[in-house]
Structure formats: structure tokens, C-alpha cells
Curated annotation (Swiss-Prot):
The gene is pckA. This is Phosphoenolpyruvate carboxykinase (ATP). InterPro entries: PEP_carboxykinase_ATP, PEP_carboxykinase_C, PEP_carboxykinase_N, PEPCK_ATP_CS. Mn(2+) binds at residues 192, 211, 248. The lineage of its organism: Bacteria, Bacillati, Bacillota, Clostridia, Thermoanaerobacterales. It catalyses: oxaloacetate + ATP = phosphoenolpyruvate + ADP + CO2.
């Protein structure tokens, strides 16, 4: 018995639960939700929402959770508004087919959460199946979901009545254990609202939830890669020498680390087999593509086209990646890499961090966005997203930072800051740091080869820079050396250091040791 009545779901037509991949694709094709393309993947156009819509995400302001939530970063909606909108959504689903995926989030059985995803589109059920953790036949028999997510993209909110900002909404009710999504078809909303849920639940169980990728070496040494979109998390953790645990969301418990998911959600703009063979080969029958341009006649994909969006995506199960760690579990991390793409060209390509510096750079969550070049603006913008994942944090940042500091200390984890951005000048003048060099620096950090080298202190950013690194020209390790105009470097570096200092002023409760670990300006 699915017991959908307890959710108020009645008078629905057919219910399709945990259908196999081929059947879900068959249903999706039949309903014209998308098309099969020449590599066997299922490609959908998601309409006007081709990315997440942070302005349309709300947390229900319930007395039981009010004190916990970081309201500076999360939008509240009243219980009354939520219930009215929920009842309209339930009424909308009457007389419609429903697709259900029952499964789990969290690969460690001790911490896993059972979820039910109810969708009106077959392909979104396939997406949930490929991204989350799939249950065994036995687990399905007595399955009871703790949390339920309902996604109905064709149901649109009315902002004036519903107290939301547009026709789209993503609303989490932690007390009712419900997530509802409407008006947007973008698959990332399903994935990231479940991540937000885990960011709420896990710290309460003593588990640090993290927006990072993870892999493991042949000797069983685990590494984590933190970084915002476009910094190289997926690319650098897909290393043929190492085995992928997961590409995006993990927990760190007393037992080690574990993937929250059972799949990957990779960016595919400009994807090529040469640069990213693992991702390229994973896009096949069973994978879902979002908003990739294709030729109607030949069904050939054009990964270079950003005609619909630059945020083109592929969702596929992790077992499509050769050598992926099937259990989704690893030991305590030996090394953590914070990735940043600095378009000002002033941060070193690699630096070793102390525990205090690790907390400082974790709370800062820095990268830079390139301004729209079509308007002739080439000045990059500094972006700070706390804990490298601000949009998904329901609790205050210090909750996560404190846990990170404690765990780094307890398990003696080494932390490095790696800049995958520009060198020799800012964006437009300098050039992007060679990916091969970045790979060599990451490899040296993971193998402990940087333990043996000398370090110099960067006077502006207060960072320890290695004097040498195997396979990397020493002159690029100190960014000042790569600039022709040293005065211009000093000015630019001080300007960015000042941005760090200004951004960090909001963390009033941070100790002096952590404050002093940051740039000096």
C-alpha cells in the first residue's frame, strides 16, 4: 500500500512506481516530454527555467524550526500560505498519472534518509532514479518514506494569492516532511532541494554535510574537492588514477565520508571526449540531458551551443563511470582541496592552509564570475558563497565551519587552496592556468609530495606558497612573478584582499585566530 491518501492525493489516474529505465523512457517518449538523441540519451528542453531559481525557494516558517534557520539567507513562507498552495497543488494532480520513485539519500546505512519523489513527468522520475540511491527489491517491499517531494512543473503559482515571487516555487516544510515544486521543470531543483534537506538533517546527527566531490586513491586515501560552479570540482575529481566516490554532495561522520547520491549531474557545455572522457562516455541510454541543442534530422548533439542556456546538464547513475566506488563510502579524508577560479589572476595556483585558514576560506567560499563580455565589461566580479554552497544552507554558516575545523583537527586532514583561474594578469590579459599543471599540483598535494618542499609566505593573502612542485614550472607558483607589471599586481591583489576583508565582517562570532588567518590587504 502506497498510502497516498495521507498526503491528500486522491482520484489520480495511474500510479507508476519505480519503473525500470527502459519503461520510464518509453513513457516519456510516448508523452512527448523529450527526444532520444543519437548517443541513446534522453534530451529534454526545460522551458523558460534552465537553471535554479533562488528567488523562488522558500522554507516554511514553522515554530518548531524557526530558531534553527539562517533567515538572512532563506526566504520564509507562512504555514497558512503553504497549506493553501499545497491543497491547490494536490487538487491539480487529481485525474493525472503519477510517477513515483522510492529510494534513499545517503550511502551510509546509519545516516540514510528514505525519500519518495512524486512527479507528473516520467523523465523526472527517471532523473530521480538516476541521481538518488536506488533501493533493492527487498527494500521496496516494506518501504516507508520519511520525506516526500512532489514536483508538478505544469502547475503554476499565483504570486498575489500564494505569497510567492513568481509562477515557480520550491518550498520545504521540515516539520511536515514535505517539499513541493511547481512552475519549473529544471531537474536541478529536485536534486538541490533534497541537498538542502540533508544540510538541515545531517548536522543534527553530528555529520558535516558538504558541497564537494570526493575520490579515493589506490592506497585507500580519500580526498575532497570543494568549489563553486565552474571551478573544476567534477573535472579534477574524475582522475583515472583514482576512484570516484561522488561528484557533488557528501557527508563526513565519525565513520568517514559518504556520498548523499547515487548519480552525477554534470555540466556539458563544450564537453569533449578528449578533455572529459568519463563524462562523455556516461552520456548514453539511461542518461538524461537538459537543454542540449541537437539536430532535428540526425539527432546529433551540439555541446558547444549555448543557444538555450550555458547551463546544459547530464544526469546519469554513478555506476556509468568506470571504477566508481559502488558503496559510495570512503575513510576520513587525508586531503581537502578548496578550488577557486580567480579571474583577477592574483591568487597562487596552490597554497597550503592551516586549520584557521581552512575555516576562513571555507566561510569565504570565494570564486569570481566573469562579467558579460558582450557589454564590453571585462572586469571580473568577486563572488563569495559561504561554505562553497550558500544557496543550499538552511542553518547558519558557523554550524558547518565549526564542524569542519573540528574534523580537520581530529583526523589531521591537510587542506590546500587551488586556483584554477588566471595567471600573468586578470581575465582578458593573463591566461587560464594550464589544466595539466593544475592536475600535477593536485596530484602532488594528494601524494604528500608537497610535505617535503619549502614554502614562502605571501604578504598580501597571508598564504603559504610552495617554492617548487613536481612537473610544474617554479616561476608560475608565485603569481606576482607571472605579471609583467608588478605594481599593477600589488594593486589588484590588495583590491581583492580588501574584498575578502569586507565580506568577512559579517562573521561577528568568529575567533580572532580565524579572522587573522585571512588576507592582510
Amino acid at each position: 500500500m502506497l498510502n497516498l491518501e495521507r498526503l491528500g492525493l486522491i482520484n489520480f489516474k495511474n500510479v507508476y512506481r519505480n519503473l525500470p529505465v527502459a519503461k520510464l523512457i518509453e513513457e516519456a517518449v510516448k508523452r512527448e516530454e523529450g527526444v532520444l538523441v543519437n548517443n541513446g540519451a534522453f534530451n529534454v528542453y526545460t522551458g523558460k527555467y534552465t537553471g535554479r531559481s533562488p528567488n523562488d525557494k522558500f522554507i516554511v516558517d514553522e515554530p518548531e524550526v524557526h530558531e534553527d534557520i539562517w533567515w538572512e539567507n532563506n526566504k520564509p513562507i507562512s504555514v497558512e500560505k503553504f497549506e493553501k498552495l499545497y491543497n491547490r497543488l494536490i487538487a491539480y494532480l487529481q485525474n493525472r498519472d503519477l510517477f513515483i520513485f522510492d529510494g534513499f539519500v545517503g550511502a551510509d546505512p546509519q545516516y540514510r534518509v528514505s525519500i519518495r519523489v512524486i512527479t507528473e513527468y516520467a523523465y523526472q522520475s527517471l532523473m530521480a532514479r538516476q541521481l538518488f540511491i536506488r533501493p533493492t527489491e527487498k527494500e521496496l517491499q516494506n518501504f516507508v518514506p520519511e520525506y516526500t517531494l512532489i514536483a508538478a512543473p505544469r502547475f503554476k503559482a499565483i504570486p498575489e494569492i500564494d505569497g510567492v515571487n513568481s509562477e515557480a516555487f520550491i518550498i520545504l516544510s521540515f516539520t511536515k516532511k514535505l517539499i513541493i515544486i511547481g512552475g519549473t521543470q529544471y531537474g536541478g531543483e529536485i536534486k538541490k532541494s533534497i541537498f538542502t534537506l540533508m544540510n538541515y538533517l545531517m548536522p543534527k546527527k553530528g555529520v558535516l554535510s558538504m558541497h564537494c566531490s570526493a575520490n579515493i586513491g589506490k592506497d585507500g586515501d580519500t580526498a575532497l574537492f570543494f568549489g563553486l560552479s565552474g571551478t573544476g570540482k567534477t573535472t579534477l575529481s574524475a582522475d583515472p588514477e583514482r576512484f570516484l566516490i561522488g561528484d557533488d554532495e557528501h557527508g563526513w561522520s565519525e565513520r568517514g565520508i559518504f556520498n548523499f547520491e547515487g548519480g552525477c549531474y554534470a555540466k556539458c557545455i563544450n564537453l569533449s571526449r578528449e578533455k572529459e572522457p568519463q563524462i562523455w562516455d556516461s552520456i548514453r541510454f539511461g542518461a538524461i540531458l537538459e537543454n542540449v541543442v541537437y539536430d532535428e534530422a540526425t539527432r546529433e548533439l551540439d555541446y558547444t551551443s549555448d543557444k538555450i542556456t550555458e547551463n546544459t546538464r547530464a544526469a546519469y547513475p554513478i555506476d556509468f563511470i568506470p571504477g566508481a566506488v559502488q558503496s559510495g563510502i570512503g575513510g576520513h579524508p587525508k586531503t581537502i582541496i578548496f578550488l577557486t577560479a580567480d579571474a583577477f589572476g592574483v591568487l597562487p595556483p596552490i597554497a597550503k592552509l592551516t586549520k584557521e585558514q581552512a575555516m576562513y576560506y571555507f566561510l569565504s567560499g570565494y570564486t569570481s564570475k566573469l562579467a558579460g563580455t558582450e557589454r564590453g565589461i571585462t572586469e571580473p566580479q568577486a563572488t563569495f558563497s559561504t561554505c562553497f554552497g550558500a544557496p543550499f544552507l538552511p542553518l547558519p554558516p558557523m554550524v558547518y565551519a565549526k564542524m569542519l575545523g573540528e574534523k580537520i583537527e581530529k583526523y589531521d586532514t591537510k587542506v590546500f587552496l587551488v586556483n584554477t583561474g588566471w595567471s600573468g594578469g586578470p581575465y582578458g590579459i593573463g591566461k587560464r592556468i594550464n589544466l595539466e599543471y593544475t592536475r600535477k599540483m593536485v596530484s602532488a598535494a594528494l601524494k604528500g609530495e608537497l610535505d617535503k618542499v619549502e614554502f614562502t609566505k605571501d604578504p598580501i593573502f597571508n598564504l603559504n606558497i610552495p617554492a617548487s612542485c613536481p612537473g610544474v614550472p617554479s616561476e608560475i607558483l608565485n603569481p606576482r612573478n607571472t605579471w609583467k607589471d608588478k605594481e599593477e599586481y600589488d594593486k589588484t591583489a590588495k583590491r581583492l584582499a580588501q574584498r575578502f576583508i569586507e565580506n568577512f565582517q559579517k562573521y561577528k562570532e568568529v575567533s580572532e585566530e580565524i579572522k587573522n588567518a585571512g588576507p592582510k590587504g
